[in-house]
Amino acid sequence: MIQEKALLELCDVTLFVGAAKLLEQVSLELKHGECLSIVGPNGAGKTTLLRVIVGLLRGYSGSVKIDGTEVRGLSHERLSHLVSLVPQRLEFLPSFSVREFLELSGLEKTEQSLSLVRHLEERCLPQLSAGELQRVLIAGAVAQGAKVLVLDEPTANVDPIGRRDIEEVLRNCREDIGLSYILVTHDISLALRCTDRTALMKAGRLVWSGATRDPALVQQLSVCYGCNFIELKHADLSAPIIVPT
């Protein structure tokens, strides 16, 4: 259930790297139990914003608070209890079973995370498909017990079956566990099915935010990307599809 109290608050976040302005006065909030997608063209600053939120980029002005705590200056260990970044992949795959990997990821929420991967728990990591591995990495982040999960393009480089599996685990996180997460994606259909609100970014700025099912989203996507988008609906689809034309 979404609560009114903000879990994550960004206020006027601006970031320079040298003379380049990567983020400009980004203000955004995520409520307890809410799931947010961040969408925008390449170079919009989406991944940069995620790196600020998880503490990998700290030279920003403005404020970033999680559960009322300013993240600037926090140790990475303390920050890991507040926010967890789900990687797209692991550079090295140890020969652990999925169960062993989740137990090593964190004891706090191990059983909860295992519920997301019940049919995979005895499989070894190197045997998993890209989609199955991404599902396990999401479960690993859940095991760490962070208040906010952050996902950067989780469906990149996966086939349709893997994409379906990732959507399923995101829905479980949202509907069954009640976790809050931020999802950066180019996949508008994924955002429609798996998030409550969508924020659009362009050239380092937040240009629009609103309910993911807001009818204004189609028009705002057209403005953001500079091309026309249309919404397609069908009785067999759980959510409409928005595509460029």
Segments predicted by a language model, with ranges:
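The feature captures the beta-strand-to-loop junction immediately N-terminal to the Walker
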Residues: 39-41
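Helix-to-loop junction immediately C-terminal to a conserved catalytic motif
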Residues: 54
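Conserved ABC transporter NBD signature motif
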Residues: 62-70, 79
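Conserved ABC ATPase signature
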Residues: 124-128, 132
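Catalytic Walker B motif of ABC-type/P-loop ATPase nucleotide-binding domains
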Residues: 149-153
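H-loop/switch region of ABC-family ATPase nucleotide-binding domains
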Residues: 185-186
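ABC ATPase nucleotide-binding domains
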Residues: 224-245
